[in-house]
Regions:
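Conserved ABC transporter NBD signature motif
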Residues: 60-68
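Conserved ABC ATPase "signature" region
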Residues: 68, 113-130
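A short, proline-enriched helix->beta-strand linker immediately N-terminal to the Walker B motif
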Residues: 154-158
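ABC ATPase NBD coupling module
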Residues: 15-16, 69-86
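Catalytic Walker B motif of ABC-type/P-loop ATPase nucleotide-binding domains
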Residues: 160-163
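Short coil-to-helix segment of the ABC ATPase nucleotide-binding domain corresponding to the Q-loop/switch region
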Residues: 98-106
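Conserved ABC ATPase signature
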Residues: 135-145
C-alpha cells in the first residue's frame, strides 16, 4: 500500500521556483495496477520518483506499508527501496558490455533460490531463453525492454515503478510488453505504478490518476 499526503515538489530555474507537485494526495492499494497520466510537464515522472523515494519532497509524506520513507536515513531508504521496489525505464538502461542475462541479474538479490537460476527462469518467462548471452546491441527494442522487466522482477519486490515502459516501442510491441508485465506481476500480486502519456494503454489498468496543474485528479 502506498499513501502520499500533501506532497510538494519544486525546482529552481534561474531565479524562478517552479512548483511541479502542489499538495498531492493519493492512495494506491496493494496489488493495484495504477497509471499516472497527464500532459507533458505535468509532473507524472516527478510524482513517481517522489513516491519511490528518489526525489525528496519539500513538504509532505510518503508511506509504504506504514513506513514513512522520508523519515529514514538516505542509506536506510536505499536499502528499503532495493528490497521493496523494482524499476523499468523508457530507455531500458542496460549495460552495453554485459549480456542480457548479466543485465537482468544486476538488480536481483539472493533469495530462496540461487540468483542466476531464478533470473534465468525469469528470462525464459519473458521469452528470451535463446538470447541470454547476447549483448544489448544485438537485441531489438522490445527484447531490451523484456530484459528490463526481468531485471525489475528479479529481486521479487512487491512494487514495480515503470516510467513510459512502452514509449520507445510501436503499439503492437508496447501492448505485448504490457501484457507480459501484467501477467508476471499478477502471479505474485505486485503493485504496478506506471507513467504513460498513452491513454489507450492506461485504460487497461485498474485505475488512472491524472496529474493536472500539480495535483492528482
Amino acid at each position: 500500500m502506498i499513501t502520499a499526503a500533501n506532497l510538494h515538489r519544486s525546482y529552481s530555474i534561474g531565479k524562478k521556483s517552479i512548483e511541479i507537485l502542489h499538495g498531492v494526495d493519493l492512495h494506491i492499494a496493494a496489488g493495484e495496477k495504477v497509471f499516472l497520466c497527464g500532459p507533458s510537464g505535468a509532473g507524472k515522472t516527478t510524482l513517481m520518483y517522489t513516491l519511490a523515494g528518489l526525489e525528496t519532497p519539500q513538504e509532505g509524506k510518503v508511506a509504504i506499508d506504514g513506513t514513512d520513507i522520508y523519515a529514514l536515513s538516505a542509506t536506510a531508504r536505499s536499502v528499503f527501496r532495493n528490497r521493496n521496489m523494482g524499476f523499468i525505464f523508457q530507455n531500458y538502461l542496460l549495460m552495453p558490455e554485459l549480456t542480457a542475462l548479466e543485465n537482468a541479474c544486476l538488480a536481483s538479490s539472493i533469495g530462496r533460490r540461487p540468483r542466476v537460476e531464478y533470473v534465468t527462469e525469469l528470462m525464459e518467462r519473458v521469452g528470451l531463453s535463446h538470447r541470454l548471452n547476447h549483448l544489448p546491441s544485438e537485441l531489438s527494442g522490445g527484447e531490451q525492454q523484456r530484459v528490463a522487466i526481468a531485471r525489475a522482477l528479479a529481486n521479487d519486490a512487491p512494487i514495480i515503478f515503470a516510467d513510459e515502459p512502452t514509449g520507445n516501442l510501436d503499439r503492437k510491441n508496447g501492448a505485448e510488453v504490457l501484457d507480459l508485465l501484467f501477467g508476471l506481476a499478477a502471479e505474485s500480486r505486485k503493485t504496478l505504478v506506471i507513467v504513460t502519456h498513452d491513454e489507450h494503454l492506461a485504460r487497461r489498468g485498474d485505475r488512472i490518476i491524472t496529474i493536472m496543474d500539480g495535483q492528482a485528479v
